[in-house]
């Protein structure tokens, strides 16, 4: 699990890869040519970044005839959210609830 998370963090560390993921979030199922159109990168650079995103399981692919379609896989990002962010969010929500109750009691 840790090795998989390391791959995800490494993949997300690069702004170009985050841009590719954002592009897939806006329009899922793009070809390499479509992904190249929206970015100021060479075809080879986009391919390299997509391969790393695939290794991190952030992008899944499917063949359609001669084309290879790329799809965003949000599961690894959600797993990181649940492990690293979700736990901290729970305390924050509880603190806001306690503050609300204290203010309501003060008004009474």
Residue ranges, per PLM feature:
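Amphipathic alpha-helical dimerization/coiled-coil segments
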Residues: 2-4, 25-26, 78-108
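N-terminal helix-turn-helix DNA-binding core of bacterial DNA-binding proteins
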Residues: 3-42, 68-79, 83
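A cross-family signal for key residues in well-ordered alpha-helices
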Residues: 10, 22, 54, 60, ...
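Short, hydrophobic-biased segments on the C-terminal half of alpha helices
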Residues: 50-51
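Beta-hairpin "wing" of winged helix-turn-helix
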Residues: 54-65, 71
